Amino acid sequence: MDENEYALIEALMERNEDMRVIAVGDDDQNIYGFRGSDSKFLRSFITDKNAVKYELVENYRSCRAVVSLANAFAETITERMKTSPIISMSDNDGEVKLIRHRTRNMETAVINDLLSSPDGGSSVCVLTSTNIEAACIAGFLNRSGRRAKLIQSNDGFDIYNLAEIRYFIKVLEAKLTSPIISDVLWNEAKDALESAYSRSSALPLCMTILDTYEKSAERKYKSDLDAFFHESKLEDFFSDENGTIFVSTIHKSKGREFDSVYMLLNNAAVNDDEARRKIYVGLTRAKNRLHIHYNNGIFDDFDTQGAEKITDENKYPFLDEMIVPLGHKDVFLGFFKDKKDLILRLRSGMKLLVTPYGMNIVTKNGQCEILRFSKSFKERLSGYSRQGYKPYK
C-alpha cells in the first residue's frame, strides 16, 4: 500500500472505533515501489496500532524444489517482515534448473529449452526483465508457428470501451425497461453480439468476460454490470488456453501462476531489495517446473534441494523480430474524431498494413488509413530502426 491508502485506512479507523482491520500482504512481493508502495505502512500496523502479526507459511501452489529455491533467495532480502520459511504442501518434488550462460543473447536458448520440454497440456510462461525481451520472444514464437500471447498491463484501458462490449451494451439498452436485466434480454444481447462480431478474434475473450459476470451475479443489475466493466482488468480474463505460451515481464506476471516458468535474467541486478523482490516474484509464479537462464553469478552460491545447475557455453544469435503492442499513448487520438463509421466496420483480427505514419486496412476500393502513430511512438520506431528493426508489412 502507498501513503494515501494508509492515510485512508487511518481515517476510517479514527471514525469507526469498533471497526476491525485485517491487513493481508507479502512484503517479499512488494515490487511497486516506483508507484509509492512501501512495506513500512504494513509494518506500522504492528508498531503504531498494536496489531498482531500472523505468518501464512503453507504454500499450495508450488512444488518442493521451487519453494526451496524461493526460500533461499528470499533470505537475501534485507528488509523483511516474514521470519519463517515457506512450506510446500505439494507432494511433487518438481523440477528446477539453473542454467548459466556466457553470452548476453539468451533468448534463443530459452526458446529452445521451452520447445524441447514436455509441457503438453500445461500452462507455460516465459518471464523477462524488459518489454523488448518479451516482445522479441513472443515474435519469434509466433513466427515459428507457436501460439504466443504477450501479457500486457493495459493501463488506462477500460473494458467498457471494447467495441464488442459497447455493442452488447447498446443492444441491452435498446430494450431495457427496468434496472434489472432479464435472462431473456441478456441472452438476446449475447446472440446479437455473436452474430455481429462472429469474425472478431476478440469475441471469445468478450464472451468470457460476460460469462464471468453472469456466474457471479444472482440478479443482473445494469448499474452493477457497468461497474464490473469499468473496474475489471482485461488481463484478468486471459484463460490459460491449451497450447498457448504466455510471455510477460516479471512485473506484469504478478498475481498469476503457471505450471511451467522459463525465466530470462540478462545481467539481473540484485544490488537492492527492490531488485531482489522482483526476482522472487518471478520464482514464485512457477507451480511444477522452473528453468532460469542467467549470465551472472546471482545463483552460484545457492545450494538448494532439487535444483540442477547447468553451464551453457554455446553462443546464440540475436533475435531479429519483436511484437510491439500499441496503446492509447502510441496513437494520435484526434485522428479518430471523424472515423466512427469506419471504426464500427472494423473487426479484431483484420490484417493491418504498416506505413511510416500509421496503419492502413485493405478495402474493396484499395487501402484506407485507420490510425496514425503518436509523436512519441514514432520516436520509438526510429529507435528500433537504429537497432536494425523495421516494421513487417
Where are these regions (language model features)?
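Core RecA-like ATPase module of SF1/SF2 helicases and allied nucleic-acid translocases
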Residues: 64, 123-278, 283-291, 296, ...
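Conserved active-site motif detector
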Residues: 300-393
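Short, acidic/turn-prone active-site loops that include or flank metal/cofactor-
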Residues: 17, 27, 152-157, 268, ...
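Conserved interdomain hinge at the start of the Helicase C-terminal
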Residues: 102-121
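Conserved RecA-like helicase ATPase core segment
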Residues: 3-94, 98
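Amphipathic alpha-helical segments in well-structured domains
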Residues: 38-42, 275-279, 374
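Short coil/turn segments at beta-strand junctions that form active-site/ligand-binding loops
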Residues: 19, 121-124
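Amphipathic coiled-coil/heptad-repeat helices and related helical stalk/stem segments
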Residues: 5, 38, 106-110, 246, ...
